[in-house]
């Protein structure tokens, strides 16, 4: 009986931890990070900006049969709860529950630079670069769970500053300001995957020439947008 209870508890904890996970990293056409996408239960997705703000969330009807390239989300009809006026001033009005997933935020008594920022999505915790750190990435996400997020610093090439450099063990490299104007600043490689663009002298200038717009690295999708 004890063994049975242990198995049930273990399965419940496993489901709690893995029901929230980062599902996609979207990169804009200019090389800037567009969103980090997180998958919850019931085909719900949360889109976060690089400074940890929730840009949108909702039901992703495309999950299971095709990629949601445009990021179109439908209203979620399950449990939705918000922090009330009785909660800490930095939390009031923010989304608290989406289904059974709890979202928490840094409170008003915590570090001034963190107040109101997203602290956790379920079991996934977030930390941020603080005000004393490099100007190119202060205020941006520093960790997502156990993954370290590194951004190009202000002393690096002008077309790289503030762009995503490392997501955990995955490295992102960009064309710098000395490259052809048609693709300077664009993503050049993600891990072992390379991207080549049409030059300013070619017909489809700046469009992707070789490389896939959607790749999968260690279970996380990286999507290169054309805009």
Map each language-model feature to its residues.
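Conserved positions within tandem-repeat grammars
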Residues: 89, 93-96, 101-104, 112, ...
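Surface-exposed acidic loop/strand-edge motifs in secreted or periplasmic proteins
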Residues: 50-101, 106-110, 124
């Amino acid at each position: 009986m004890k063994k049975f209870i242990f198995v049930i508890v273990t399965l419940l904890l496993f489901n709690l931890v893995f029901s929230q996970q980062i599902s996609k990293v979207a990169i804009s056409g200019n090389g800037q990070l567009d969103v980090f996408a997180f998958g919850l239960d019931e085909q719900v997705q949360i889109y976060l900006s690089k400074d940890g703000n929730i840009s949108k969330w909702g039901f992703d009807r495309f999950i299971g049969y095709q990629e949601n390239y445009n990021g179109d989300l439908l209203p979620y009809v399950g449990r939705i709860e918000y922090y009330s006026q009785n909660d800490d001033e930095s939390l009031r009005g923010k989304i608290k529950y989406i289904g059974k997933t709890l979202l928490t935020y840094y409170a008003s008594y915590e570090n001034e630079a963190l107040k109101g920022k997203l602290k956790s999505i379920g079991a996934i915790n977030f930390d941020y670069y603080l005000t004393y750190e490099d100007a190119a990435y202060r205020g941006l996400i520093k960790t997502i769970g156990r993954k370290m997020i590194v951004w190009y610093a202000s002393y690096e090439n002008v077309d790289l500053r503030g762009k995503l450099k490392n997501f955990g063990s995955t490295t992102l490299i960009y064309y710098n300001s000395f490259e052809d104007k048609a693709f300077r600043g664009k993503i050049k490689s993600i891990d072992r995957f390379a991207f080549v663009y049409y030059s300013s002298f070619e017909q489809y200038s700046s469009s992707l020439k070789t490389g896939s717009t959607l790749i999968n690295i260690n279970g996380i999708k990286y999507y290169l947008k054309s805009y």
